[in-house]
Regions:
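Basic, flexible Lys/Arg- and Gly-enriched helix-loop patches that mediate nucleic-acid binding at interfaces
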Residues: 1-178
Length: 178
């Protein structure tokens, strides 16, 4: 799914807010979001009815990279880049260092490309806050080698079998044969 801003990564909400499953017209299976993007974030989101795959993709021991495009206010200094790529403690947890590059920079701000290998709650926003950066827009653009590839915002598609196989292989245990 290409999750739009303004939707919760949940199946229901007791406060009546829109949920990503509201966008799944014609899907009869009970599916659940894999991981999360906060209410004001957008981008690629996997939903599944496969509990084993969901557990593999969300368990911390499986480090499948997720790439984000992060638009921040202003120019990003070398010092701020160093903070973002250092070992930070967020909410009492040491987080894995991220891969980071500047995609573009202009008068409206800087676009960063960040690769994360774990997904703590609001991790990118908290990392940027630690570096004194204000996030203007946050989009997840890939999960491993899965990309949106032109999928319109608010739309979804079924994964191809080779994509499901890739996710299982990318998250397999060392002693497990797929």
């Amino acid at each position: 799914m290409n999750k739009p801003r303004g939707y919760l990564c949940s199946t229901t909400d007791d406060r009546g807010r829109k949920c990503v499953t509201d966008l799944l017209e014609g899907v009869s299976a009970r599916v659940y979001p894999v991981g999360r993007l906060d209410l004001v974030s957008e981008g690629i989101l996997l939903l599944t009815d496969d509990g084993e795959l969901k557990n593999r993709l969300t368990h911390p021991r499986h480090t499948i990279g997720k790439i984000y495009r992060v638009k921040v206010d202003g120019k990003v200094s070398d010092e701020q880049m160093e903070i973002l790529t250092s070992e930070l403690v967020i909410d009492g947890y040491k987080i894995l260092p991220v891969s980071l590059s500047v995609s573009s920079e202009d008068e409206s701000g800087t676009v960063l490309k960040m690769t994360l290998f774990e997904g703590r709650n609001r991790q990118i926003r908290k990392m940027c806050e630690a570096a004194n950066l204000t996030v203007k827009r946050l989009s997840r653009i890939s999960i491993g080698n899965l990309k949106l590839d032109g999928l319109p915002v608010g739309k979804w598609r079924y994964l191809e079998q080779h994509e499901v196989d890739y996710l299982y292989k990318a998250t397999k245990e060392k002693n497990e044969h797929v």
